A protein has these predicted regions:
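Multi-pass membrane catalytic core of lipid/isoprenoid biosynthesis enzymes
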Residues: 44-52, 68-118, 193-234, 273
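Helix-coil boundary and interhelical linker segments in multi-pass alpha-helical membrane proteins
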Residues: 27-50, 102-116, 150-170, 221-237, ...
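N-terminal, positively charged, Ser/Thr/Ala/Gly-biased leader segments
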Residues: 1-21, 25
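Intramembrane alpha-helical segments
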Residues: 4-9, 50, 57, 77-168, ...
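Generic alpha-helical transmembrane segments of integral inner-membrane proteins
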Residues: 24, 49-57, 97-105, 119, ...
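Small-residue-rich segments of transmembrane alpha-helices in multi-pass membrane proteins
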Residues: 21-26, 81, 142-157, 202-205, ...
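Extended hydrophobic alpha-helices typical of membrane-associated regions
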Residues: 2-5, 218, 225-288
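Cytosolic, membrane-interface loops and tails of multi-pass inner-membrane proteins
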Residues: 1-5, 60-87, 181-205, 253-262
Length: 288
């Protein structure tokens, strides 16, 4: 049980609420819009959830392994499992390999397209770990790694690409990229000292927050497009309105002079935003 707790801490399992709700939204849309009833529905649902868990374990495990020396020098992250000695770098890397294999095997059991795309998905979710060493756009790479979740969930059901899940992927990418900029404010000085790239390390705090707001404007615009293309239902519009309100609250709470609220804005509000939107959209899709 102690080992499970350590690895759950390694991958920040609680942060699964950022991407999983969007995958379930896309899965629901794929099912209700299918021209014929989806066979083995519960098996497909299980496969999608397993893929989400395995892919996230790969992403977070690889990130912690790749960055453990950097984390050890940062007072904010020195207590993480690898630099703190709770999990060895070798054990963490094996954890990544095992989850990557499990992910690929699971995609093979779904359909040919998910199987062929599985290496691409793994490459994307691992890319973020090194992007911060080269580009300030790493925030968007992180967003993309979460954004592929709704596309993958749709493909798992339908075996093809479609516009609506791709729009939702853009929603997730810009939403996540925006709140990651806010989160990165905590490491601004450290990143500058170490030569690491991030929006806050490159720009002033105020400019960084403006960029974050700009990305969230794109999020809301894409969300409105997404909602407009779905079956018109009051529940879906309520979900979009509440999601937008929570995003606005995030920027009210975090300003250049009020950075103490970063933890609440990053974890609590964004988790609430994704769960709220998914709940109302799924209800709307099922009752449309």
């Amino acid at each position: 049980m102690n080992a499970i707790s350590k690895y759950a801490g390694l991958v920040k399992f609680s942060h699964t609420i950022f991407a999983m709700p969007f995958a379930l939204m896309s899965l629901t849309y794929a099912i209700v819009s299918a021209p014929a009833p989806v066979s083995d529905l519960w098996i497909v649902l299980l496969q999608v959830v397993l893929c989400m868990v395995f892919a996230r374990n790969v992403a977070m495990g690889f990130n912690r392994w790749a960055d453990w020396r950097i984390d050890a020098e940062n007072p904010r992250t020195a207590g993480r499992e690898i630099p703190a000695g709770k999990i060895s770098p070798k054990a963490a890397l094996w954890f990544v390999v095992i989850n990557a294999i499990a992910f690929i095997i699971t995609t093979i059991t779904i359909n040919p397209l998910t199987a062929w795309l599985s290496p691409v998905a793994l490459a994307i979710v691992m890319a973020y770990s090194y992007c911060k060493r080269f580009t300030s756009l790493a925030h968007l790479v992180l967003g993309l790694s979460l954004g592929i979740a709704p596309v993958g969930a749709y493909i798992a059901v339908r075996g093809e690409f479609a516009l609506i899940p791709c729009i939702l992927a853009f929603v997730v990418m810009t939403w996540c990229g925006s709140f990651d900029i806010i989160y990165a404010l905590q490491d601004r000085d450290f990143d500058r000292e170490r030569g690491l790239h991030s929006i806050p390390a490159r720009f002033s705090i105020r400019t960084s927050l403006y960029i974050s707001i700009g990305l969230h404007v794109l999020t809301i615009a894409a969300l409105l497009w997404y909602v407009w293309l779905l079956p018109h239902n009051i529940w879906i519009w309520i979900g979009a309105a509440l999601f937008t309100a929570i995003i606005i609250l995030e920027h009210v709470l975090v300003t250049p002079s009020r950075q103490r609220n970063i933890g609440i804005a990053f974890g609590t509000l964004n988790g609430l935003a994704s769960l709220t939107l998914a709940t109302f959209v799924i209800i709307g899709l099922l009752t449309a």
